[in-house]
């Protein structure tokens, strides 16, 4: 019998550990490299904990170019830029712009969807091997917005419809019925009924990491 192939993974977050476990199942010898211990304060420690296989619409989308100026000018916007770094980032930025076409967006979205469509069954396979009682809730995931028009969400809704994503565009009344404690400043939303979220991402991560160490 040949030697077991050795594989190294950089990063002891949820992606690194999950990939390591599936590689172990395939018979590979896996080593995870990370400067910090698994479960330390990083991305998989304090994120929202969403299991979101619907999130197949990429950032490289045509409408993002019209949104960027407003984001940069807003003091509370989600985008900030160090202006002395502009010259260094220009080659990357020009390449990004070239990818913000409908054709490139759909190419990325279709490939992301194929991968994400396998995510929940893959997590379920791993969770069958650990005790996660009460750590994962299957209540769906709700996105809401306060625009009076759906136009700001038309693109992503249409892309997900084309990909066959299970989504439900809902009215303010339906939002209130689902989440009566949210202040009614919203004008619409999208509900993904099969979405899940982790109550404690760190605990799930550490349970998966312990499973990795035992194999």
Residue ranges, per PLM feature:
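Rossmann-like flavin
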Residues: 90-210
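Accessory recognition modules or surfaces
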Residues: 2-10, 14-15, 39-53
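Glycine-rich FAD pyrophosphate-binding loop
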Residues: 25-45
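Short beta-strand/turn micro-motifs composed of small residues
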Residues: 11, 34, 145-146
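N-terminal Rossmann-like FAD-binding beta1-loop-alpha1 element of flavoenzymes
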Residues: 5-31
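A conserved beta-strand/loop element that lines the FAD pocket in flavoprotein oxidoreductases
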Residues: 212-215
């Amino acid at each position: 019998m040949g030697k077991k192939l050795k594989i190294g993974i950089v990063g002891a977050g949820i992606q690194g550990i999950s990939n390591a476990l599936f590689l172990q199942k395939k018979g590979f010898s896996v080593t995870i490299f990370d400067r910090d211990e698994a479960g330390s304060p990083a991305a998989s420690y304090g994120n929202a904990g969403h299991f979101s296989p619907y999130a197949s619409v990429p950032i490289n989308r045509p409408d993002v170019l019209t949104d960027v100026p407003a984001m940069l000018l807003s003091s509370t916007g989600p985008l900030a830029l160090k202006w002395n770094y502009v010259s260094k980032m220009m080659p990357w930025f020009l390449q990004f712009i070239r990818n913000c076409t409908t054709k490139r967006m759909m190419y990325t979205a279709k490939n992301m969807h194929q991968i994400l469509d396998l995510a929940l069954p893959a997590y379920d396979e791993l969770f069958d091997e650990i005790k996660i009682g009460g750590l994962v809730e299957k209540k769906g995931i709700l996105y809401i917005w306060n625009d009076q028009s759906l136009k700001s969400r038309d693109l992503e809704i249409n892309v997900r419809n084309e990909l066959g994503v299970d989504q439900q565009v809902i009215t303010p009344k339906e939002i209130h019925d689902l989440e009566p404690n949210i202040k009614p400043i919203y004008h619409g939303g999208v509900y993904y009924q099969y979405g899940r979220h982790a109550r404690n991402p760190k605990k799930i991560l550490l349970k998966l990491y312990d499973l990795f160490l035992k194999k």
